[in-house]
């Protein structure tokens, strides 16, 4: 078995971005970690799918109370929220 990845804000941002881009959203080439997620099509169903994918991919569970508009604004803000659950 390999060791768990060292999840830091940068690696989490990249992983969350990949999940959003490849599994959750139908996005254009211009989609970046700083793109607004609601503008990119994130809705409540997509949030549920996203959080399940993040937990499955990283092993990090995020409390629903942290899924605020501020934390779901961009990939980067969401990754920081996920990272906060490691403390």
Predicted regions and their residues:
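Phosphopantetheine carrier-protein modules
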Residues: 22-40, 59-66
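Thiotemplate assembly-line natural product biosynthesis machinery
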Residues: 2-29, 80-87
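STAS-like cytosolic regulatory interaction modules
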Residues: 1-2, 67
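Phosphopantetheinylated carrier protein domains
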Residues: 48-71
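C-terminal structural segments of small proteins and small subunits
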Residues: 67, 72-85
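Catalytic nucleophile serine of serine hydrolases
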Residues: 44
């Amino acid at each position: 078995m390999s060791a768990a990845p060292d999840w830091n804000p940068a690696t989490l941002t990249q992983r969350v971005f990949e999940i959003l881009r490849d599994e959750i959203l139908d996005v254009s080439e211009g989609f970046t970690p700083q793109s607004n997620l609601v503008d990119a099509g994130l809705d409540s169903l997509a949030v549920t799918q996203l959080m399940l994918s993040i937990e499955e991919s990283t092993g990090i569970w995020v409390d629903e109370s942290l899924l605020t508009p501020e934390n779901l604004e961009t990939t980067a803000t969401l990754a920081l929220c996920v990272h906060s659950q490691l403390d």
